Design a protein with these regions (language model features):
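Nuclease catalytic cores that cleave nucleic-acid phosphodiester bonds
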Residues: 82-211
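Domain-level signal for Mg2+-assisted phosphodiester chemistry and nucleotide/NA-binding surfaces
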Residues: 2-102, 155
Length: 211
């Protein structure tokens, strides 16, 4: 006789994603990859005209959709171009162009930062935006310290079985993530194409306070 050890309710509960988690997060963002993600299947922003003022809020929203109620303490932005924007809470790291060194500069710089964050236990979560599977060892080492690593991804992450067949390297990298944080290319492009003022938004003075 075949026994059904699980009720339908418990089966459905078993299929649910992990419980929502909280804590602090630091984002390590490969600018080159983020632009590619925004341009995926559409015309996206140019590298030299990126608006990063709303990036933190955008990433917090994406993390929330992945079941992560976290605050972003800081963003590290790894860019090949000279950046003209100074954004609070964002540190720019200049790296060599991928065409000139095959991404070695990014691999070394971002990898060292990830290792230091893990060793110092500076945060509970790291959001990583890159598609370079050479980070697998660095990610695994960081996770062994208890740090949770989440990776920014496109819609392809919703079908991992197919992704492993179409892009094995990208699939292996995403499989290592504690959470895959999916963003829509259109929404990302719209955020990055926003008005990129070189100065922080001005706060309107309250006339009552002035008096």
């Amino acid at each position: 006789m075949k026994r059904d050890y699980f009720s339908h309710a418990s089966k459905d509960a078993y299929r649910q994603p992990l419980d929502q988690q909280s804590g602090s997060c630091i984002a390590l963002i490969d600018a080159r990859f983020l632009v590619w993600l925004a341009q995926h299947n559409q015309a996206g922003p140019k590298k030299d005209a990126l608006n990063r003022f709303d990036l933190a809020q955008f990433l917090i929203g994406a993390l929330g959709h992945a079941g992560l109620d976290v605050s972003i303490k800081r963003i590290y932005w790894y860019a090949e171009e000279n950046e003209v924007l100074d954004v609070d809470g964002q540190i720019v790291r200049k790296v060599l162009s991928h065409d000139s060194d095959g991404g070695i500069s990014l691999l070394k710089t971002l990898g060292q930062d990830l290792s230091r964050l893990a060793q110092s236990k500076a945060c509970d979560h790291v959001l990583l935006a890159t598609d370079d599977e050479r980070f697998l060892t660095a990610i695994d080492d960081a996770q062994l310290t208890g740090l949770q690593i989440h990776i920014l991804a496109d819609d392809a992450a919703s079908n991992m079985q197919q992704l492993h067949q179409s892009d094995p390297g990208w699939g292996r990298l995403l499989s290592q993530a504690d959470r895959r944080v999916v963003v829509q290319a259109k929404s990302l492009a719209e955020m990055l194409q926003g008005s990129a003022s070189k100065e922080a938004p001005q706060v309107q003075e309250d006339p009552e306070v002035i008096r």
